[in-house]
Amino acid sequence: MNVVILDTGCANLNSVKSAIARHGYEPKVSRDPDIVLLADKLFLPGVGTAQAAMDQVRERELFDLIKACTQPVLGICLGMQLLGRRSEESNGVDLLGIIDEDVPKMTDFGLPLPHMGWNRVYPQAGNRLFQGIEDGAYFYFVHSYAMPVNPWTIAQCNYGEPFTAAVQKDNFYGVQFHPERSGAAGAKLLKNFLEM
């Protein structure tokens, strides 16, 4: 199977690459349209700011390429947020617009921001991405912005208020947490995605 990690220039790809390799796949890191469009599975990781990430997406001519993908795509952390419409970061950043939902800063309920560490995730029953993962399993988060719960939410987390921990629209999936840092539950989620 052809697994590709999209080289957005704004992510530490080694941990994602290693996590995929543990399942017996050799992912390619690329932004070449021919390689990306022929991938069976595509990963869209991201760390840092939405502005820097979208600058890289445009500079590397990835905007239309990502939107043209028909294979399963998994956005991780900031990569999930990029699937949204607009981020409140940096006075507003236009995103890919695949999911018609904004990404606001998380509300301060007296809890520290960024939301960092282990938290429970509650998936919708029956979603293939969470098959075999117990309800309320712990995943590892590091973020200050989050997509609200919306019609495309497939898993929720609570940090002062509920937010989207995972999302799906058609072939595009996103997880706000880091599956590559989330132990057995994260490994199972990656396996589920790779075996779709």
Swiss-Prot record:
InterPro entries, sorted: Class_I_gatase-like, GATASE, Imidazole-glycPsynth_HisH
Q: What UniProt keywords are attached to this protein's entry?
A: Amino-acid biosynthesis, Cytoplasm, Glutamine amidotransferase, Histidine biosynthesis, Hydrolase, Lyase
Q: Active-site residues?
A: C77, H178, E180
Biological process (GO) annotations held by this record are: L-histidine biosynthetic process
Top-level division of the source organism's lineage:
Bacteria
Q: Which HAMAP family match?
A: HisH (MF_00278)
Give the protein's recorded name: Imidazole glycerol phosphate synthase subunit HisH
